[in-house]
Amino acid sequence: MKNNWMWCLVVLLSLGTIVPLQAQTGGTEKEVAALEQQWLQSQKTNNPDLVAPLIADKFIGTGADGKVTDRAQLLAAAKGSKYDSMEYEDVKVTAFGNTAIATGASRVKGTDETGKPMDTHVRWTDTWVKMANGKWQCVASHVSLIKS
């Protein structure tokens, strides 16, 4: 009988640690989704200062053209691009402890930093890490062209 009570106690204590973890995961996913929306606002308003704090110093991005960019290149491109419209679709965030993966698609119309017109549909994946200071930053991003 004593062993049964011990076993029940272990199970109940285990549930107590699982429930907060699930709540934290849901909060993490909402927090990272909000950061993705902040990134979108930055692009729509042509204001790279909104996204700069969200991009890690060692950021690595891969564009739909296969070019690899760093943080400085990403922010320079954001400053020079002009968007007539940009909307996110099918955004999903999955948390894995201090890492979160955000995926989605974007329809983009406007001009890029070189003045070339854009009218594209892309799928993207962003990798976010919760840094030592407790803030989330995007460490990697990959964009693929969706063919019509």
Question: For each predicted feature, which ranges?
Answer:
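A detector of low-complexity, intrinsically disordered, Ser/Thr/Gly/Pro/Ala-rich segments
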Residues: 4, 15, 23-26
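Bacterial N-terminal signal peptides
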Residues: 8-20
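A beta-strand edge to alpha-helix "cap/lid" segment located at domain peripheries
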Residues: 22-148
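Bacterial N-terminal signal peptides that target proteins for export
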Residues: 1-9
